[in-house]
Amino acid sequence: MAPTHHAIDYIELNVTDLAASKAFYADAFGWRFNDYGPDYAGIVAPDGDGEVGGLNPSGAVVRGGPLVILFSDDLEASVAAVRSAGGQIVEEPYDFPGGRRFHFADPSGNELGVWTSDSGH
């Protein structure tokens, strides 16, 4: 699929430990990676066509930046997967207009959110 003008195309997460971060996201969400050596890993798109982001171990992890929010068909299963993979829940699931969501910190301290809609999609 061709990129869309001005659409968000790629999200890069700064991480403190590339191997630990790859293991966390693979275990919690089933993400796959393209390895570019010890200094970078690309996050493979869900359909396997290209990349949607990357993990950068050379950047500083800064709290309070933009919040990346993932979608889940089963929010409670996602909470359990994050905990099982070693993530920390920083905001327990809560309701908001149209759905529910929670926030977690990955092993590097990046905060992300996960949401689900009232209808599941």
Give names to the regions the model predicted.
Residues 10, 21, 40-43, 52, ...:
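Residue-level detection of beta-strand scaffold positions
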Residues 1-22, 49-50, 66-68, 118-121:
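N-terminal beta-strand motif that seeds the catalytic metal site of vicinal oxygen chelate
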Residues 1-4, 8-16, 59-121:
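Vicinal oxygen chelate
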Residues 30-36, 88-93:
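Short secondary-structure junctions
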Residues 31-65, 111-116:
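Conserved short beta-strand elements that form part of the metal-binding/catalytic scaffold
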Residues 25:
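Catalytic core of tubulin tyrosine ligase-like
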